[in-house]
């Protein structure tokens, strides 16, 4: 079977079949499909210009400001937390709101909270 035939066979598979294929390959060869991601992340962190290449950010609530109720509502909306948990997060600031989010999402969350007077930091 040639590479092209294998590729054509893979193209014809459903997502469920592809998932089963990946699991079977992991078992057969004793590897994990997630391992290369961890290795690549470690290599990027060791580079000198890793800060310029950062693609994931943590959104941290530094202070709630004067509109605490609006901030609690926004925390619930962004995180999906219940009222009690959202209030505890706001009361315990500085606390992380969301972790490992894309730059666009992090900027949108920051803008939303700053609009209602909260202080947000992106890490």
From Swiss-Prot:
Q: Which GO cellular component terms are attached?
A: cytosolic large ribosomal subunit
Which Gene Ontology MF annotations are present?
mRNA binding; structural constituent of ribosome
InterPro entries on file: Ribosomal_bL12 (IPR000206), Ribosomal_bL12_C (IPR013823), Ribosomal_bL12_C/ClpS-like (IPR014719), Ribosomal_bL12_oligo (IPR008932), Ribosomal_bL12_oligo_N_sf (IPR036235)
Database matches in Pfam families: Ribosomal_L12 (PF00542), Ribosomal_L12_N (PF16320)
Instruction: Give the UniProt record's GO annotations in the biological process aspect.
Output: translation
- What keywords tag this UniProt record? Ribonucleoprotein, Ribosomal protein
Summarize subunit and interaction data from the UniProt record for this chain: Homodimer. Part of the ribosomal stalk of the 50S ribosomal subunit. Forms a multimeric L10(L12)X complex, where L10 forms an elongated spine to which 2 to 4 L12 dimers bind in a sequential fashion. Binds GTP-bound translation factors.
Q: Which family does it belong to?
A: Belongs to the bacterial ribosomal protein bL12 family.
What PANTHER family does UniProt report for this protein, alphabetically? 39S RIBOSOMAL PROTEIN L12 (PTHR45987), LARGE RIBOSOMAL SUBUNIT PROTEIN BL12M (PTHR45987:SF4)
What is the role of the protein in this entry?
Answer: Forms part of the ribosomal stalk which helps the ribosome interact with GTP-bound translation factors. Is thus essential for accurate translation.
What's the name of the protein?
Large ribosomal subunit protein bL12
């Amino acid at each position: 079977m040639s590479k092209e035939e294998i590729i054509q066979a893979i193209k014809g598979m459903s997502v469920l079949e592809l998932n089963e294929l990946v699991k079977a390959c992991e078992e057969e060869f004793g590897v994990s499909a997630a391992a290369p991601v961890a290795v690549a992340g470690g290599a990027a962190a060791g580079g000198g210009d890793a800060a310029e290449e950062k693609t994931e950010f943590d959104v941290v609530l530094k202070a709630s400001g004067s509109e605490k109720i609006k901030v609690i509502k926004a925390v619930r909306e962004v995180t999906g937390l219940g009222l009690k948990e959202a209030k505890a997060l706001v009361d315990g600031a500085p606390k992380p709101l969301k972790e490992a989010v894309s730059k666009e999402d992090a900027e949108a969350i920051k803008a939303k909270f700053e609009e209602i007077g909260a202080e947000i930091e992106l890490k």
